[in-house]
Amino acid sequence: MSDVQHGAFASFEEKWLAANPEQATVALFLAPEARLRSAAFGSLVHELEQAAFGLSEAQVAEVKIQWWRQELLAAASGSVRHPLSAVLFADPKTAQVDAADWMALCDGALAMRHVGAASDLESLLGEYSALYAPVARIETALFDAPIAGAVTSARLWAVSHLLLALRHLADVPERLPVPLDLLARHETTRSALAEAVPKRAELVRDHLGRLASTLQNALAEAPRAPLARRVRSRLDLALMQNAAHSADPLRAVVAQPGGARWKTLWWSWREARASART
């Protein structure tokens, strides 16, 4: 990689690490050849997530995702333009990825622009599987995880996203990050979510409990999921459990309590050790 290419790649990696700071610690427990691959894939997913969830203008988002579709299609055929795809497709492991999954990845990102309200948590997770199922399949191929665990790994990704999206609940986003049955159970309305009242606190606490249960089950079912995914899920679970015991659980989720660096080091070491034994 030339200095120019390295600088371009590093700028995307920095954006990914800013959003996923635990991955800098996780990288210490990866084999040297897997570190760059992890950064390239993580940065690619981050770019697509930003287009799918972070851009307000639909046309701009769709153009960006379609550009990535063409880039990944060309990269799979040996022609690359973007520094992320240049690094990723230079890795021999990438040849193990089914070419159709690159297209499914972009289709899933486009589908996220049209996610609506879901009746219950399973339906909500199902909506996000359009993106995170291909993400998990690709990650599984890149890091030699059992393909049978890809479905469960996709749930780890989806729950992580829903926890992140919950931080914007008070803004009453168009893509509601909680299911409708939760609103009915707590006798509240979508617009009332903007108010820091006891009903909202109980709703968020209830939702965190359901997400935590889903995450615990998924972690138990996918003991050989990629290290990066399991560590992130462990940290998410700790945050959910701590926030659920707070007087204002939404505020606790937004604040992301300190000490995460040591928690990351602990879980990275523990999960890497467990992976080595399986």
Question: What residue ranges belong to the model's regions?
Answer:
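Hydrophobic alpha-helical segments and helix pairs
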Residues: 90-138
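Catalytic cores of Mg2+-dependent Asp-rich isoprenoid enzymes
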Residues: 1-89, 105, 128-137, 150-159, ...
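Catalytic palm subdomain of template-directed nucleic-acid polymerases
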Residues: 140-143
